[in-house]
Every structure is written in C-alpha cells, then in structure tokens.
Amino acid sequence: MKLSFDSIVTKEPIRLAIIMENVIFDTRDEYGELHSESTMRKKYHEDLKPIPGAIEAFKNLNSITDLRNRKIFDVNIISTLSLTNQKSYINKIANVQKWFGDEALKKLIFCQDKSSIRTDILIDNSFKPQNFPDTNKFTLNTPYLQIRYGTDETNFYQIKSWTDNDYLDVIKKICIDLGLLVI
C-alpha cells in the first residue's frame, strides 16, 4: 500500500540523518583492493559519484510538507571523521557542494561516534559496534531508529534503492509507527 503525505501532520520537523559513504555516495568502487591507498589520494572524495537516485531523494525529502504546509523532514548528511587523511574533509565538502548544492553544505555533519548525532532516524548501510560504544548489535539501544540502505540485513527496516519511491513508504511507515507523524 502506497502512503501519501497529503493527509499527514507533523508537530515539528523529523530529524533524518543519511550516511554519506555507501548510502549517498558510492565508495565501494573507489575502495576496491586499494582501500588505504585510494582514501589517501588527494581528491578521493571529490571524485565520488552519488548513488543513483540519491540526489533526487535528498531534494524530495527536504521538500515534503504536511497538510498545513510545514516542512516534514530536517535532513542531514553524516560523514565519518578521517584521522589519517585530513584533506578528506575539504574533498567531502567539495563533493557535497558539487552534487547537492550550497544548501546541502549547511546539512553536512562530521562525526566519529554516530550515537552522538541528535536525530530521530538514521539511514546507514552497516552497524559497526565500535561506532556505538555503549551499544551492542543485539539490543541496538541507540538514540534513534535505524534504517539499512542496500543491505540484506533482516533485523532492520530496509531501503533497497533511491531510484523508486519505496524509500518514502518505508520512512513514512516508521514515522507513523513512532508517532512522529499523525494521519
């Protein structure tokens, strides 16, 4: 069943965080066998290409309004800190600006510990216990709900692709289930 946003109301914008690596930008092709060598390249993150449909999905999520014409989502792009390649910050910023525009730069957040992010929902491609010091994979006691992008993990809500609008149905269902949206 397809859900519409036409009859939905939100009390305040829902904080939605999307991981940059392998959710918005495809880093798998770049990493390959030369992971450490390729990440040290001067323009590594500047050369990355968005995952198909990611630009449109980001813009779409940022433009959705509720029945009262209030913005539903506050969407941020989250990227990991690189302790070995300080130039990666400049390149990541340039890449986000190149593909997503100046407004997206205001929504780019760098962090080492994802659990420190103040968000309602995180769209990520993996769970790494080292990024959640007080959390284990079984309890997933994180401060936000997690959605997996492009994986086959069955313990999580799934978004398989940005190229169809199924991602909207997944996000909307979760928001309704959590009481963040009212029909």
Swiss-Prot record:
MF-aspect GO terms: 5'-nucleotidase activity
Domain of life of the native organism: Viruses
Gene Ontology BP, a term: pyrimidine deoxyribonucleotide catabolic process
Protein name: Uncharacterized protein R758
Species this chain originates from: Acanthamoeba polyphaga mimivirus
Organism ancestry: Viruses, Varidnaviria, Bamfordvirae, Nucleocytoviricota, Megaviricetes
